[in-house]
Amino acid sequence: MTTTLQRRESANLWERFCNWVTSTDNRLYVGWFGVIMIPTLLAATICFVIAFIAAPPVDIDGIREPVSGSLLYGNNIITGAVVPSSNAIGLHFYPIWEAASLDEWLYNGGPYQLIIFHFLLGASCYMGRQWELSYRLGMRPWICVAYSAPLASAFAVFLIYPIGQGSFSDGMPLGISGTFNFMIVFQAEHNILMHPFHQLGVAGVFGGALFCAMHGSLVTSSLIRETTETESANYGYKFGQEEETYNIVAAHGYFGRLIFQYASFNNSRSLHFFLAAWRVVGVWFAALGISTMAFNLNGFNFNHSVIDAKGNVINTWADIINRANLGMEVMHERNAHNFPLDLASAESAPVAMIAPSING
């Protein structure tokens, strides 16, 4: 009897590429989402760096008054930004080949669209890559669900809000002072501080920070000491050890006595779910609030809600906020508007009640 051993034909180039892309043995997992993520994020990053350093001023309001945003045009790290594309462009897709020249493309803020479109696609693929790696490793898929909260926020300020307002010039500038300007104008036009979804977002972010500090301090304070008093307690932990590194019973007992028993978790899994869900749900609501205000479903308006017996207004803090909003609104885009929109849209007071009779 003769046994024949035949070497398996080597995989072709495409199969080797597929195996490399989906391999979990790589130092950094690539994945099929990564095939899109890497070039798009690289394009967005390179364009952002170049534009932040050297882009010429952009006619953001479409009234031939360019706004400088780059370092070489007089800005610093705090005041610098990639200025959003011009209001003259509106919501039109404005790639380089749509402009008559590179100078025109830069003047109308073309780099802003290039950056945000590549960034949003790359960031979305990053979320897909999180799911893909979890799937390959047999993990549950909740990491990408948590990441969806900041991703939804990015979509809200860079895409949904400009769509609702009718122009990418209303998108958030890519810089520190530009972000502050975006926030101030947003408050002036939409009263975001009085929107319940934004309030839930504040509770999510600040509450998440509080719970993170509480959890970290409780765990650090209830470590099971494996070292001497002269050594750091951190040396008592070995990566991959089977034993618990802190005493959850002690932490539960401490916190239950500090507040009350049922304020403390006695289940580590439900505790960590709560730590993740609180912040994620809060930021989801904040992104949803931005997306609703994009279409002018604004925050609560309690102006002139308290009056005396004679009908005179008794000012509340809501009226003070309203005056601040009007002040901010008249200050922004000074040369693009004669009046803030709230004043311009009010009913006009008639000067003459009836038309004069003309004899002759």
Swiss-Prot record:
Removed propeptide positions: 345-360
A molecular function GO annotation: iron ion binding
CDD domains recorded: Photosystem-II_D1
Source domain of life: Bacteria
Residues given in the record as Fe cation binding sites: H215, H272
Keyword Magnesium: yes
Site note Cleavage, residues: A344, S345
Chemical reaction(s) catalysed: 2 a plastoquinone + 4 hnu + 2 H2O = 2 a plastoquinol + O2
Gene Ontology biological process terms, A to Z: photosynthetic electron transport in photosystem II; response to herbicide
Marked site: Stabilizes free radical intermediate: H190
Subcellular location, record wording: Cellular thylakoid membrane
UniProt binding sites for [CaMn4O5] cluster: D170, E189, H332, E333, D342, A344
Positions on the Lumenal side per record topology: 47-117, 157-196, 289-360
Pfam families on file: Photo_RC
Residues that coordinate or bind chlorophyll a PD1: H198
Site (Tyrosine radical intermediate): residue numbering on this chain: Y161
Binding positions (a quinone): H215, S264, F265
Record PTM text: C-terminally processed by CtpA; processing is essential to allow assembly of the oxygen-evolving complex and thus photosynthetic growth.
Residues that hold pheophytin a according to the record: Y126, Q130, Y147, M214
UniProt main location, coarse: membrane
Family: Belongs to the reaction center PufL/M/PsbA/D family.
Protein's name in the database: Photosystem II protein D1
Taxonomy of the source species: Bacteria, Bacillati, Cyanobacteriota, Cyanophyceae, Thermostichales
